[in-house]
Amino acid sequence: MVKKKVATKKNSPSLAIAKKKSRSNKDVVSVEAPIISSYNDRIRPLLDTVDRLRNLNVMREGIHLPTIVVVGDQSSGKSSVLESLAGISLPRGQGICTRVPLVMRLQRSSSPEPEIWLEYNDKVVPTDEEHIAEAIRAATDVIAGSGKGVSDAPLTLHVKKAGVPDLTMVDLPGITRVPVNGQPENIYEQISGMIMEYIEPQESIILNVLSATVDFTTCESIRMSRKVDKTGQRTLAVVTKADMAPEGLLQKVTADDVSIVLGYVCVRNRIGEETYEEARMQEELLFRTHPVLSLIDEDIVGIPVLAQKLMLIQSSMIARCLPKIVSKINQKLDTAVLELNKLPMVMASTGEALMALMDIIGSAKESLLRILVQGDFSEYPDDQNMHCTARLADMLSQFSDSLQAKPKEVAEFLMDEIKILDECKCVGLPNFIPRSAFLAILSQHVDGIQDKPVEFINKIWDYIEDVLSSVTAKRSDNFPQIQSSIKRAGRNLISKIKEQSVNRVMEIVEMEKLTDYTCNPEYMTSWTQKTSAQESFIDAVVKNENIPDYFSVTGFGNVKISHLRKYHAHLLIPAFDMKMRITSYWKIVLRRIVDNLALYLQLSVKSLVNTRFQKEIVAEMVDPRDGGGVEKMLEESPLVASKREKLQNSIKLLKESKDAVAAIVDQNC
């Protein structure tokens, strides 16, 4: 007697595989309606729990369930395998027979009468064994249309029958590359996309149906499963039509060129009018007596072995995944409840709306206080534009540098002073500088810079307006219906403050024209230092005509003096003195302008945050002449209403899912 060769794959470390008893063992499981009795009574509660979660559509919450996904190329014999497992007839014909995901729930029953029904589109349609194929076709036409197209909307088939294995499988359309008989041009893309969606999750077990008549390495279903399961840890292969291509089959399943870690099961398809019991008997006879097929290890042949393996794999996967599923359900439920609680309550009265508005403005005020006054930007750690005290300091520093930058000399040295003195002369003692002359040249200096402070203050308030808009938008995010009103109110407030600030800045600048005064001792120190070279300068201009045309003056560098030799000393002396006075005093003026603007800015910002913001925004929002912002809060925006409904539906689904798994988790604790 020839000793059989073993063609069994080594078991996956994570999923146990059952061994069938020897063919010589008299106690081998009897062949019932289609196959065998259930693995044990623990499978059914686990499977019912997962099926309950599947019916609840918990997958739409991003929670993947342990699923046996049946895939195969067109005409691979996929339908025959499922028929043999369930003991029922599925739609047959040319082209794609399965056009929607068919969720097959097989449940062992002690009743002699089978119960079969379909579920789709929230409907339950009872049927029987004789009419099941017809009922599936009719349901498929409702879901996917009466043509040849496919749909990803599932159809659930319940089979409660004596002798069936406790299994839930998802049968997907067979893979076809070339559209025929009115199929859509992108039929391959539609089917492959549907298959990838089901087999990609790590919780999916891939039942890959392969025909013994083809080279496994060329099968499209193998190529697709290897994309998501490169090592084959989640893939079990069923080799159909073993009786049609027995030669080389042993080598195929032994060599395992396509890396199927969960192993192979070789089966014989039901032929013609055979009953399922006759088909199983013929299958057992084939693998026991065929000169080639009998060499294949008995642990990997036959529909009963396939059913047993699938049940064990399924129960192991469910037991392994259930704690993770429970954890994900709890996590997503907590997140959904938290998100729902963050949404604004539905306003029932103007009083409630006003209170909500005060909360929005109050929280915005606190944010503005932190970022504009206290320098606390913890609320916006990564948004440097919202680090307001730093940005205001930057703008003030840039303004100071720009204001105090040394202007380019247009007139020749002392010529402006000489012209002013000439125009301001009067009958009186010589060598006295008329105050009017000093104020005249001071006014010229002020006129030269008067636009810069106004530009600076406008820039400051434009920036603060952007900040205020960002803060109020964030705080009123749950009330989009009033965001435009709050933004307009904020813009109006900043516009008023900006106008007041510009007027104040213009006053500060104008004051510098009217009075030449400072108590800063630096003025006298600087003037004394600069005038110390006056005598040598006058001598160089008036007495020493042979010296070079340039003279070094402290604070001015080398200045041209040849153009001054036509003037008398009694004019040059006051001109030089006034030049040194205005230069020393002008530095004081510029610093004073910067200081005054800095102090005024700080005062204005604090006034905005502490007093004006809340008072004026609320006043404008409650004024019916401005659109009645408070009344708008009574109308929940479509966006928030949609978000609320979605969260409420998610919470309902997740709570039901939590209840569904609670009992089974308690039993397994």
Swiss-Prot record:
Subcellular location: Cytoplasm; Cytoplasm, Cytoskeleton
Cellular component aspect of the GO annotation: cytoplasm; microtubule
G3 motif as annotated region, ranges: 171-174
Keyword Nucleotide-binding: yes
Region annotation G2 motif: where it falls in the sequence: 97-99
Xref: Gene3D superfamilies: Dynamin, middle domain, P-loop containing nucleotide triphosphate hydrolases
Region spans: G5 motif: 273
Chain residue ranges for the region called G1 motif: 72-79
Segments for region (G4 motif): 240-243
Keyword Hydrolase attributed: yes
Positions that bind GTP: 72-79, 171-175, 240-243
Residues of the Dynamin-type G domain: 62-323
GO molecular function (one): GTPase activity
Family in the record: Belongs to the TRAFAC class dynamin-like GTPase superfamily. Dynamin/Fzo/YdjA family.
Biological function: Putative microtubule-associated force-producing protein, able to bind and hydrolyze GTP.
Protein name per UniProt: Dynamin-related protein 4C
Organism: Arabidopsis thaliana (Mouse-ear cress)
